[in-house]
Amino acid sequence: MVALSPAACEELGIQLSEEDRKKPYIEMSGRKGLGVKADDLINRLEEDALTEVATRHPQLSVEEQSATAHEIAVGALRYFLLKFTRNSVIAFDFKEALSFEGETGPYCQYAAVRANSIFRKLDENALNSANELIGKVGSDKDISAKVGEALAGEAGTEIWALIMLAQRLDEVIAQCAAAAEPANLAKYTFNLARAFNLFYHRHRIIAEEDRTRQAVLIATADIARRQLTAALATLGISVPERM
């Protein structure tokens, strides 16, 4: 069942009684004349997202700001609706849906935007060079040893965990299809975004001076961003160029 939070009702101009304002959610009811169109939600989300985008990126043209706001709004709504299991009450709330923190579409989109920004700042051949170096593991003893060192300890364990999580995408999609439960994919996408953000904050990918270690970090970031982008696309959510 889809409902609205009292705050969302007020934002949409739906009049509520004092009793309704105290409820956790307001059920939509045609009989009572309470209803909302998806377009109304998108339009309101776009307005709020545009304000944030214009503040963060005043250098963008109006058209670019509007396009970015639309992508964020659609991502926010789709993720919010998909993150709940089929038998749950979906109490839509604008502030919660558009938050850049927590289990939201914008949070997942922002993680992918961050990942893409890494590769815009790196040399255009950095990824190919990293993959070429990693490809020598097993045939070159020195490189194998250095890669092993880069993947040792707690940091290495976290890198492996991110890689293994990213590689589970196909498995998760298959499970969701079998169970007809897209909420599982939404949860996986959030977990992958959160794992990447942790990786992003703990490692100096662009500034890393050790060539082998940087190659490991670049390869890991690429795997994570490709799988995160694919997971979002499966949910019908695109990744803006900037957020």
Where are these regions (language model features)?
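Non-catalytic interaction-recognition regions
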Residues: M1-M243
